[in-house]
Design a protein with these regions (language model features):
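P-loop (Walker A) phosphate-binding loop of NTP-binding proteins
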Residues: 3-4
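Hydrophobic positions on the alpha1 helix immediately C-terminal to the Walker A/P-loop
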Residues: 12, 16
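Conserved catalytic-core segment of NTP-binding enzymes
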Residues: 22, 108-168
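Residues at the starts of beta-strands that form the adenosine-phosphate
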Residues: 28, 91, 148
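Conserved lysine of the Walker
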Residues: 9
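Short, glycine/acidic-enriched loop or turn micro-motifs at the edges of active sites
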Residues: 36-38, 99, 133, 157
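Cytosolic-facing regulatory segments adjacent to core modules
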Residues: 75-84, 88, 93-129
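N-terminal phosphate/diphosphate-binding loop that engages ATP/GTP or pyrophosphate donors
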Residues: 21-88
Length: 168
């Protein structure tokens, strides 16, 4: 789910997750909060202990501290830790991107998120992604694995322009 900010993307994403859980109780469903505003966890009543950004920061810290591990070991550990960030609930699994502390571009976290979506999407029947407002995740092909994209907006020119840009 993508589009303009403040128009209900998170509410729609939560509704889709709940509907999938009720309609397909035997299917594996993953909800991804890809919005740094971190609202999907609240909408779904999830308590998040570890986020994707927490894992990314830990990996960077290990490298910066001169950890003697080989690069492949660090990558394998990062991949394994993704599963630590998953929150298992009744009927679905949840993971959150978190709120990167630095201002500006979320390039690094979005690149990591893209890899995580690629890894996890193979393990679930349905993956619902609550995307951040605007076009950055679309432009960076974070949602490259997406088969269906719902664009949500209001009637403002800015909102229509965001959706038109994403659509094109």
């Amino acid at each position: 789910v993508a589009g303009k900010g403040g128009v209900g993307k998170t509410s729609l994403s939560a509704t889709i997750v709940k509907t999938l859980v009720q309609t397909y109780p035997d299917k594996k469903i993953l909800a991804i909060d890809a919005d740094p505003a971190v609202g999907l966890s609240t909408a779904l009543g999830i308590e998040v202990k570890h986020t994707i950004d927490d894992i990314r920061k830990d990996v960077i810290e290990n490298v910066e501290q001169g950890n003697n591990k080989q690069a492949i070991d660090i990558l394998n550990e990062a991949r394994f830790r993704i599963y630590d960030a998953l929150v298992e609930t009744d009927g679905f699994t949840f993971i959150a991107v978190g709120r990167p502390e630095s201002a500006g571009c979320y390039c690094k976290i979005n690149s990591y998120l893209k890899d995580i979506i690629s890894i996890l999407s193979e393990e679930f029947d349905y993956v619902v992604i609550d995307g951040e407002a605007g076009i950055e995740q679309i432009n960076r092909r974070v949602m490259e694995k997406v088969t269906h994209l719902i664009l949500i907006t209001d009637t403002s020119k800015k909102g229509r322009d965001v959706c038109a840009t994403i659509k094109n």
